[in-house]
Amino acid sequence: MEPEIRFAGFPAPWEQRKLGDVATIVGGGTPSTNNDAYWDGDIDWYSPAELGEQVYADRSARRITQAGYDSCSATLLPAGKTILFTSRAGIGNTAILRRSACTNQGFQSLVVNDDTDVYFVYSMTDRIKNFAEQKASGSTFLEISGKGLAAGEFAFPSKDEQTAIGSMFKQLDHLITLHQRKYDGCANPLFLERRISCRKPSHQNRCSATTTPSG
């Protein structure tokens, strides 16, 4: 399903694609906390509690050493192409990685392919979160697996149209951040209303329908 309103110059239909076809889903790992040689290194290592409302992840609270990294199942995630995605204990908190880093087991992060715009996918994360929460399972706490997340199907336009939409949301997020700083957390209501209405799960596959100019 494609949006009713689109940027001019993009006539091609949107296509349903599995998330696993546009991104590699990567889990994490934790070195032994009993070995001091594994900690206080220079490799960023994230836990779910560190993700909140920020768009970007710049620096983790804890870091591990190369020995710690080698000792566990953590994977180094590339900067600029990775969306951290919490998979339990609060499913669907996200941030775009600005520095190469790894995570603990509480993530199923999305490393987008070269033909996919990272900010476009980031603009979809509320819908991805909604899917993940519906598919999550577990007796102790709900969790979505990498395989389960990869199976989610969403509508995608061409890379150029993704970039146009992603750029629009990037500008909106930047303006929201500026207003938050200026007014001590109070963002411009117009931008907040547009962003929230666009990213609500009930507007699935229509991320540009309420905000994208046609000219």
Please annotate each region the language model reported:
Residues 6-29, 206-215:
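Non-catalytic DNA-recognition/assembly elements of restriction-modification systems
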Residues 8-13, 109-116, 148-161, 166, ...:
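Proline-centric
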Residues 4-9, 140-141, 150-159, 174-177, ...:
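Short, recurring structural edge motifs at helix starts
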Residues 186-189:
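Hydrophobic topology marker
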Residues 20-156:
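DNA target-recognition domains and sequence-specific DNA-contacting regions of bacterial/archaeal
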Residues 3, 21, 163-175, 179:
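Extracellular/lumenal glycan-associated surfaces
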